[in-house]
Design a protein with these regions (language model features):
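Structural register within alpha-helical repeat arrays
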Residues: 163-166
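Short beta-strand-to-loop acidic/aromatic patch adjacent to the donor-nucleotide binding site
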Residues: 1-11
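Catalytic core of nucleotide-sugar-dependent glycosyltransferases
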Residues: 117-123, 130-156
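Conserved donor NDP-sugar-binding/catalytic core segment of glycosyltransferases
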Residues: 15-50
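Alpha-helical elements of Rossmann-like donor-binding domains used by nucleotide-donor carbohydrate transfer enzymes
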Residues: 15, 19-22, 100, 104, ...
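Conserved nucleotide-sugar donor-binding catalytic segment
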Residues: 43-132
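Membrane-interface aromatic/basic loop that binds lipid-linked glycans or pyrophosphate carriers
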Residues: 171-204
């Protein structure tokens, strides 16, 4: 059984369900496959972002990110796996970045397809129209996101970027739902708190 989440301002191509049915035969044949990742397009047919470098093979979310192939995608999940990874709740906040859940799929791969399954129409006043304001309204959610990413970093540069953002949102967040980072890089996290002013300027 598959699960396909479509945003309220998006719609499907006439043959999207048929395409999903066809792709699912290959996707579900692999035991550690969590579903399908395909493209999104605008109403004029132009693709959102870039086409995948590798079509018809399996990648994890992290693989795609490291290849520079992330971004807006149509994602079809295997329901049995998706049901294990729920969005956490942070009191008083309304937006949780999808990456918090996607990062939990590190042991699962997805069939990659260069077919567009979703037609997207961005709303002028939609959630993503002002990302900085959205993040500032949900500091606990972004504290959690960047906290989890610190140990995932593939390079020191990437890790430092996550730590800077984590420290900023940890300082901004006044709630108690999200615990502080206590991983292997705790000393580095603490030593970089003085750099909060640098990140603060970027959110003004």
């Amino acid at each position: 059984v598959l699960f396909f989440n479509v945003d309220s301002d998006d719609w499907l191509h006439q043959d999207s369900l048929l395409q999903i049915s066809t792709l699912s035969q290959q996707a579900l044949a692999k035991a550690d496959s969590a579903g399908i990742i395909a493209l999104k397009s605008f109403a004029d047919g132009s693709i959102i972002g870039n086409k995948f470098i590798h079509d018809g093979i399996f990648h994890t979310f992290r693989d795609l990110e490291l290849l520079g192939q992330g971004g807006e995608r149509s994602i079809v999940f295997r329901t049995a796996i998706a049901s294990k990874f729920r969005f956490p709740l942070v009191s008083g906040e309304k937006f949780m970045p999808e990456g918090i859940v996607y990062d939990k799929y590190h042991d699962f791969s997805f069939l990659i397809s260069n077919r567009s399954l979703t037609i997207c129409e961005y709303q002028e006043n939609g959630l993503s129209s002002n990302p900085k304001a959205l993040m500032l309204r949900n500091p606990g959610c972004y504290k959690l996101y960047y906290r989890n990413r610190i140990d995932m970093a593939a390079s020191i540069k990437e890790r430092l970027g996550y730590i800077l953002r984590y420290n900023f949102f940890a300082h901004t967040y006044k709630g108690t739902d999200v615990e502080d980072y206590r991983g292997a890089h705790s000393l580095l996290v603490r030593s970089m708190k003085a750099l909060n002013c640098i990140v603060s300027r970027s959110y003004k």
